[in-house]
From Swiss-Prot:
Cited function: Catalyzes the transfer of an acyl group from acyl-phosphate (acyl-PO(4)) to glycerol-3-phosphate (G3P) to form lysophosphatidic acid (LPA). This enzyme utilizes acyl-phosphate as fatty acyl donor, but not acyl-CoA or acyl-ACP.
Subunit structure: Probably interacts with PlsX.
Record's keyword annotation contains Transcription: no
EC code(s) of this entry: 2.3.1.275
Entry keywords, A to Z: Cell membrane, Lipid biosynthesis, Lipid metabolism, Membrane, Phospholipid biosynthesis, Phospholipid metabolism, Transferase, Transmembrane, Transmembrane helix
InterPro entries listed in its UniProt record: G3P_acylTferase_PlsY
Record GO cellular component, one term: plasma membrane
Pfam family for this entry, one: G3P_acyltransf
Name assigned to this protein: Glycerol-3-phosphate acyltransferase
Pathway annotation: Lipid metabolism; phospholipid metabolism
An annotated Gene Ontology molecular function: acyl-phosphate glycerol-3-phosphate acyltransferase activity
Length: 202
């Protein structure tokens, strides 16, 4: 029962709509009605500006980071392989990612999983995250597409998991990569059509 409560709390933490709350409190704007209509960090930068965008990014990363340590904070006692699996910080992190993408507070219409996924990786493999961040920004510099850079970084996370032989991370990174590609499907179509907006600050 405690494991179920822990996973539920991770989902609720992930559901915290950082971009929407920052937009409404400080800018009197619902970012879902501007830009791409997305609730995540990229649209927050676009609609609310850089300072607010950085705050939203930090909060979304923190959501993924903090839940990784829930198994240490909750009195969970795995009694078998299944319960042990669900008390792994990475698996708990998946529930936060799902909360971010399908938040209960926003009728299950949320962000695209990038920043919160980065927070989960930060909690379990910070060096890997540094490498992925370098890949993300290099791709961003070359292409100017945030969506494409996110997808490339997610795929590289799968490859990195294979290299370091962390098979739970591999499973999680595959799930996240599939989810992230699915959430960016309209961006992918726009890239092929030449209609995807490019960043202008790099």
């Amino acid at each position: 029962m405690m494991i179920v409560l822990m996973l539920l709390l991770a989902y609720i933490v992930g559901s915290f709509p950082s971009g929407v709350i920052i937009g409404k409190i400080f800018f009197k704007k619902d970012i879902r009605q501007f830009g791409s209509g997305n609730t995540g960090a990229t649209n927050s930068f676009r609609v609310l500006g850089r300072p607010a965008g950085f705050v939203v990014t930090f909060l979304d990363i923190f959501k993924g980071f903090i839940v990784v340590f829930f198994p240490l904070l909750f009195p969970v006692h795995p009694t078998g392989p299944i319960s042990e699996f669900f008390t792994n910080g990475l698996i708990v992190g998946v529930f936060a990612i799902l909360g971010h993408v399908y938040p209960i507070f926003l009728k299950f219409h949320g962000g695209k999983a990038v920043a919160t996924s980065a927070g989960v990786v930060l909690g379990v493999a910070p060096i890997l995250l540094l490498i992925l961040a370098a890949i993300f920004f290099l791709t961003l510099y070359l292409t100017k597409y945030v969506s494409l850079s996110s997808i490339v970084a997610a795929i590289c996370c799968v490859i990195g998991s294979l290299i370091i032989h962390d098979y739970i991370l591999l499973v999680v990174s595959i799930i996240v990569a599939i989810l992230l590609i699915f959430r960016h499907r309209t961006n992918i179509v726009r890239i092929f059509k030449g209609e995807e907006p490019k960043i202008k600050w790099m």
